Structures are given as C-alpha cells and as structure tokens.
Amino acid sequence: MSENSSDSDSSCGWTVISHEGSDIEMLNSVTPTDSCEPAPECSSLEQEELQALQIEQGESSQNGTVLMEETAYPALEETSSTIEAEEQKIPEDSIYIGTASDDSDIVTLEPPKLEEIGNQEVVIVEEAQSSEDFNMGSSSSSQYTFCQPETVFSSQPSDDESSSDETSNQPSPAFRRRRARKKTVSASESEDRLVAEQETEPSKELSKRQFSSGLNKCVILALVIAISMGFGHFYGTIQIQKRQQLVRKIHEDELNDMKDYLSQCQQEQESFIDYKSLKENLARCWTLTEAEKMSFETQKTNLATENQYLRVSLEKEEKALSSLQEELNKLREQIRILEDKGTSTELVKENQKLKQHLEEEKQKKHSFLSQRETLLTEAKMLKRELERERLVTTALRGELQQLSGSQLHGKSDSPNVYTEKKEIAILRERLTELERKLTFEQQRSDLWERLYVEAKDQNGKQGTDGKKKGGRGSHRAKNKSKETFLGSVKETFDAMKNSTKEFVRHHKEKIKQAKEAVKENLKKFSDSVKSTFRHFKDTTKNIFDEKGNKRFGATKEAAEKPRTVFSDYLHPQYKAPTENHHNRGPTMQNDGRKEKPVHFKEFRKNTNSKKCSPGHDCRENSHSFRKACSGVFDCAQQESMSLFNTVVNPIRMDEFRQIIQRYMLKELDTFCHWNELDQFINKFFLNGVFIHDQKLFTDFVNDVKDYLRNMKEYEVDNDGVFEKLDEYIYRHFFGHTFSPPYGPRSVYIKPCHYSSL
C-alpha cells in the first residue's frame, strides 16, 4: 500500500477507496424492495458495530501484542478461508444497483438487506475475534491495523437538491460518488435512460465479474498484508531480543563503569595519601638538606679559617727551621774548632774520677745483692720453722682428738665430764685461733718478701731513671750553652759531673734505706714469728698441765687458770705484750716521691695501772700517742684497719652518746648520771670528734666501761650489766665485735651502722 492510495474490499461492507483523482465510489448491496429508501435500523446497527470494532482495534493497538512466526501463517490461512466462505454465501441474485439523480453528480447505491448485514456483522465480529485471538496487532517496530469502512451519512435529498446538499447534517446510509456535474436532463430523458439501463442488463454480469476480480485482488492484498505483518512481527521480536541484549550490555557496561569508577576513586584516595606522605617526606628531606647545607657551610668556613691558620703557622715554622739550620751550622763550626784545639788534661782527670766512682758503686751493688741473698735464705729458714710449727699443731690436734675420744668412752656419770667437754671446746677454739695466726704469719712473710722484691725493682728503675736524667740534664746544659752562646765546653762538663754526683748520692741513699727497711722488716718478722710460736708452746703446755691436774683431782680454781690465759690471749691489749708485737700489720708511709712499707705500731694499755674512776683522768695512764700516724683521720683509719679489718672515719661525740643511751635504756631501767658521764666523755673529744691521734678508741671504750663499773650504784649486784658494752659499741661502729689483730686483711668494707635512737 502506498500513501496516496488504499483499497479495501469485502463481501458485505467492504469499501474500496481510491484517491486517484477526486472521484469516490461507494458500493452497497441493493434489494429490489428498498431501492431508494434509507434504512435507519441498518444505519444504527452499523454505527454500533463500527464503534465496537474501533474500541476493540484500539485495545488491540494499545496492548501491542506480539505474535511469533509460527502463529502468523495459520492466521492468514483462516482469514483466507473465511473470505472464500463468505463469497459462496453471497446470493447470486444480489445485485448492486445504484441510483442516480439527474440533477446531481452523486450516484447512490442501495443498502444491502438486513440478513446480509447480519451476516456481515458476524463475519466482522469473527474477524475481530480472530484478530484478537491471533494478536495480529502492532509490533514495536511497525503497527498494522484493520480499519472498518466508515459510513458516510448524507442528508436525504429533497426535490430541490443541488450540489450544495453535501453539507447537510442528515445522515444517509447509502454511499455516494461525486462525479463531474453534467447538464440537467429533463424527465423525458431520464425515462429514456431507465429504458436504456434495463436494456443493458447483460452488461451487469460483466461488472460482477469485474467485482469478483477486484475481490480477489483484495484477498491477495490482505494476504500480502498478513505476510508483511508476520515478517514485521518476526523482525520486531528479533529487534526486541537485540534491544534486551543491548540493555543487558548497557547494564553490564554501567556496572563495569561503576566498578572502574570505585577502583579509580580508591586509587585516587591511595594516591592522595601517598601524596601526603611524599609531601611530608619531601619536607623532612628539605629540612635535612637545609641543615646539612648549613653544617657544610659552617664546616667550609671553619676549614677556610683553619687553612689560613695552618698557612700562617707553616710560614712561622719555615722561618724557625731556617733559623735553627743557621744555628746548627754555627754549632758545627764551633765543634770543629774545639776538636781542632783538642781535649785538655782537666777533662781527662774528671773522666778518671767518674770511672772510679762508678766502680765503687758497682761494688756496693754486689754487696747489696749478697746481703739480699742472705736475707732470702733467712726467710726460707723462717718458712721452714713455720712448717715445723704447723706440724706440731697438727700433732696437738691429734692428741686432743684422742683425749676427746677417750673421754667419750670413759664414764659419763663422773662429775668432771661436763667441765672436760668445755675445756675440749676451749682447746679446739685455741687451736683454730693458732691456725689462723699461723696462716696470717705465712701470708705476712709472703707479703714482706714481695715488698722486698718490689723495693729492689723500684731502686733499679730509679737508678736507670737517674742516669737518664743526668744525661738529659747535661744535654740541656749543652743546648743552653749552645743556644745562648755564653757558655763553653767546660761548663757543660761541669754540669755533667754535678748531675752524676747527685745521681750517685741519691742512689746510695736509696740503697741504704732499702737495706735498713729490709733488715728491720725481716727482724721484726722473725721476732713476731718466734714470739707467737713461743706463746703457742706456753699455752699448749699450760693446757696439758691443767688437763693432768684435773685428771688427778685438781680443784676447780686450778681449772679456771688457763681460761684467764686464753682470755688474755684473745684480748692482747689487756696484757702487757712483748716487744715483738709492736709492729704488726704494714702500712704505707709517704717518703718523697715513693711510698715505702712501714709497720703499724700497736699501743697497749698497762694492766698494772690504775683503773679509771669518776675522779681520775684516764688520759694519764694511756700510752696511746701515735708516732706512725698523722692526724685524726689517718689514726682512726689505721686503728680500725688493724683491729677490725675495716676503714672507719673518726668517731663523733653525738653518735657515741646515742649508742650509750640506747644500751642503758636496753639494760637498765633508770640511769641518773648522764651529766657526770658527759663530763667524762667530753675530755676525749675535740670539736665533737674523738682524739684518735692521742688515744686508742678501744682504750677509751674500756675506760668508759670501767668508769661505769666503778660507780657506787653498780659496784655491788650489777650482774654484769656493762660486760657487753664494748661489744655493743664495736658492733655499731665496726660491724662486728672486737677480734685479735691478726688474720688476712680484707678489702675495704663499709661497716653497717644500726639506726640510732
């Protein structure tokens, strides 16, 4: 179908519309009874059917149902079959007769019968239903609809009808055709025409055949339309699938785009964070580079100044070197002049004297070495004696063990078993003390031997140093004479001679001092060893004598005698010691440039002297003035080191008084003599510090103890209240109670002081 032409045909109600020119032909079935009268019933029925068809077609077009290719072909076949059936139903007698008026160019065809109209309506309804059943509507790409023929309502012609009656409002069921206006014909002429038409009935058959051929064309056209609709539907389904695929693709692309966008945003965030960190790192690097730049600039300036300073110093050194080279050349010239003159007789004599003096010194050294060898042999002899005494002690220990064993096997009911056990314990304690003493003496002998060797080595080093110093002094004198050019060669030799004399004199003095020190030390050592062993023998002899007396029924008073001996031995400061105990425990005394070992001199208290009383000054009876120490601090440290193996600072008065108060409160309920005791104590303190350089602290403690004992209130029935006062004081200041001044010396340990009141 084209835009300019559209043809439609059916058995009843088919309308063929052609826009070729301005003519319109309408064909309707005409009955012989109703040729020219309008049928209002038919027109109303046709209007209702047309309205229903239009509504159904609108709904079908709105629904836009889509048919597959399989349903298209049976729908076409059914439509073709219905058309053929309708053609057969049409009666042969039905002849389309048109009426024409002479006065107008409109030809009116008579409407068909009511039965035919009903059949046509049924066919139209079936076609509409089939179109709805088969969904022959429109696709998404192209829509095809079957349009029902529109009824043209024309006004009923009047007697005076003309061409202007077309605009009348009265509808007519007949179809009209507008033709070219002809001239008006008279009534006679119309009658002639009717006669002529009746004569031309055979020509109607030809028109019928032409109509059937037109109907066939319409059927073919409908088939073409159906096929085109099927193809359009198929093409529409393909397009829909393609569009769905496109939509899916679009959704997938959108999802991918969103994912890419999210990943891009995340990357941008990370890049932003990285950018921040890079920015911070760049700032740090910038600050570091700035600092390095500043340091480099400062170093550069420092190096420049240092370089300039070195240049100046180099120039000065070059000048000094040139001047020294000039002086050296001058000195060489002077030496050559002196060599040419030759050596004088005075120089030869001085050299001979120096050689003799050196030979004498060598002889003295040889004699000193021989004396040293003799002293070493004496030391070895003393060591042997020590070993013998040790063997004796071991033998005594064996005898003691035998005695203890025999006592255990003896009668346990005897009254003297308990006392014998006590004596055995005392003897064992004495033996342990003697062993300690022997070990200490052996260690001390080793110490003196080592000190002797060190003194000898130091003397040798000093001799070599003196020689070197003499050479240096002569060299300096020469340089001085050469530099000033005021001295002469004689002055240089005089300086050398004087320096060598001083060295020899100093060396002699050192050798004498070393000899005296070694002799004195060895003599004191041997005397101390002999006295200790003599004392050991006496004590052991007394012990065994006492043991024999006890066995044969000696009295209890005789048994108490060795205990006093042992107590005197444990506390030798209460007993008048021999001369061998004066110098025990080496100390170091400062002598010029070198420290030399000197024995510390212990001081004792005279047991025969009077005891301290409240009215007596104990400083008169004290022989504690120190000759080997200087100052309060030195004497306090020497006393604490020799007696307690610790180093203690001088004792303060307030601390000592607090200790006595604490002891009194602990042992006594009341003590009313604080003022008297303070007056007695104040005599031994100067500026709040004890006078260690005038009196031993142990003697002072014993004096305080005796002073408290001699008070009238505590002379009788004191129950030994003050017996442990000295131990309490020693424990506070020195960390332990008083012990004999032998045994190996320990490293300095600070005493643990108890908290004062």
Swiss-Prot record:
Main localization category: membrane
BP GO terms, sorted: positive regulation of cell cycle; positive regulation of cell population proliferation; positive regulation of transcription by RNA polymerase II
Coiled coil: 248-272, 306-450, 504-530
GO cellular component: membrane
Gene3D superfamilies referenced in this protein's UniProt entry, alphabetically: Apolipoprotein
Extent of Basic and acidic residues compositional bias: 190-207, 458-468
Domain of life of the organism encoding this protein: Eukaryota
Region (Disordered) location: 152-207, 458-483
Localization, UniProt: Cytoplasmic granule membrane
Residue ranges, compositional bias (Basic residues): 175-184, 469-479
Membrane-topology descriptor: Single-pass type II membrane protein
Record InterPro entries: CCPG1/PBIP1
UniProt KW keywords: Cell cycle, Coiled coil, Membrane, Phosphoprotein, Signal-anchor, Transmembrane, Transmembrane helix
Sequence intervals crossing the membrane: 218-238
Protein's UniProt keywords contain Transmembrane: yes
Keyword Cell cycle: yes
Annotated stretches, region: Interaction with MCF2L and SRC: 1-308
Lumenal face residues: 239-757
List of residues that carry Phosphoserine: S186
Function recorded in the entry: Acts as an assembly platform for Rho protein signaling complexes. Limits guanine nucleotide exchange activity of MCF2L toward RHOA, which results in an inhibition of both its transcriptional activation ability and its transforming activity. Does not inhibit activity of MCF2L toward CDC42, or activity of MCF2 toward either RHOA or CDC42. May be involved in cell cycle regulation.
Protein family membership: Belongs to the CCPG1 family.
Known partners and oligomeric status: Interacts with MCF2L. May interact with MCF2, ARHGEF1, BCR, VAV1 and FGD1, but not with TIAM1. Interacts with GTP-bound CDC42 and SRC.
Name assigned to this protein: Cell cycle progression protein 1
Taxonomic lineage: Eukaryota, Metazoa, Chordata, Craniata, Vertebrata
